[in-house]
Amino acid sequence: MLALINRILEWFKSIFWKEEMELTLVGLQFSGKTTFVNVIASGQFAEDMIPTVGFNMRKITRGNVTIKVWDIGGQPRFRSMWERYCRGVNAIVYMVDAADLDKLEASRNELHSLLDKPQLAGIPVLVLGNKRDLPGALDETGLIERMNLSSIQDREICCYSISCKEKDNIDITLQWLIQHSKSQSR
């Protein structure tokens, strides 16, 4: 009976109460940022993704939550834009190619450099280790260690190992994002 009442309450909330959140998606080139946006928006995976030049903005609705996603290019010439697009968002999603171990140091340095910016203090960060379906890809424990995530103490930080191709852990990623649309009012 209680479950039925909860479902009815959720249904009423979905009709009368809409949530909006804004997030910025950053990370090195070829980590899978645009692919991630396409997977959460449409459920579709495409092998032949064109690298983002500059930025793309996309609105995605899941239930009663509309997520405005800023997908920022990861090439070196666009990294100076990351801070500007991260200001005032509900969350920063940092994408890592968990199978490209040669780029992990550069990725770690870029993440820590970004999070050192005073204007971004306190904004929650979700680190996604993409391409877990590839051989040698790091899991969450490996990512936390190699990206030195435990040293980040001034904000909430979460890390998931995902595969956009296989759609692994996309559901828990969306749950985290939706939870942060409700807990943050920026």
Swiss-Prot record:
Signal peptide: none annotated. One of its GO terms (cellular component) is axon. Pfam families: Arf. It is found in: Lysosome membrane; Synapse; Cell projection, Axon; Perikaryon. Disruption phenotype: Lethal from late larval stages. In garland cells, results in defective late endosome-lysosome fusion and inability to form a rapidly exchanging terminal lysosomal network. In motor neurons, results in defective anterograde axonal long-range transport of lysosome-related vesicles which leads to defective protein localization to presynaptic active zone and synaptic vesicles. Fully mature presynaptic vesicles containing synaptic vesicle proteins (e.g. VGlut) and presynaptic active zone proteins (e.g. brp/Bruchpilot) accumulate in the soma of motor neurons. The keyword Membrane applies. PROSITE patterns: ARF (PS51417). GTP binds at residues 29-35, 71-75, 130-133. The keyword Cell inner membrane does not apply. It comes from the Eukaryota. Expressed throughout development, from embryo to adult stage, in different tissues such as larval motor neurons, salivary glands, testis and ovaries (at protein level). GO terms for biological process: anterograde axonal transport; autophagosome-lysosome fusion; axonal transport; cell division; late endosome to lysosome transport; lysosome localization; neurotransmitter secretion; presynapse assembly. GO terms for molecular function: alpha-tubulin binding; beta-tubulin binding; GDP binding; GTP binding; GTPase activity. Keywords: Cell cycle, Cell division, Cell projection, Chromosome partition, GTP-binding, Lysosome, Membrane, Mitosis, Nucleotide-binding, Protein transport, Synapse, Transport. Residues 1-19 dip into the membrane without crossing it. Required for normal functioning of the late endocytic pathway including lysosome motility and late endosome-lysosome fusion. Not required for the delivery of lysosomal membrane protein-containing vesicles to late endosomes. In larval motor neurons, mediates the anterograde axonal long-range transport of presynaptic lysosome-related vesicles required for presynaptic biogenesis and synaptic function. Acts downstream of Rab2 during presynaptic precursor vesicle biogenesis. Essential role in chromosome segregation. NCBIfam families: small_GTP. Interacts with tubulin. Interacts (in GTP-bound form) with Rilpl. Interacts with unc-104. Belongs to the small GTPase superfamily. Arf family. This is ADP-ribosylation factor-like protein 8. The lineage of its organism: Eukaryota, Metazoa, Ecdysozoa, Arthropoda, Hexapoda.
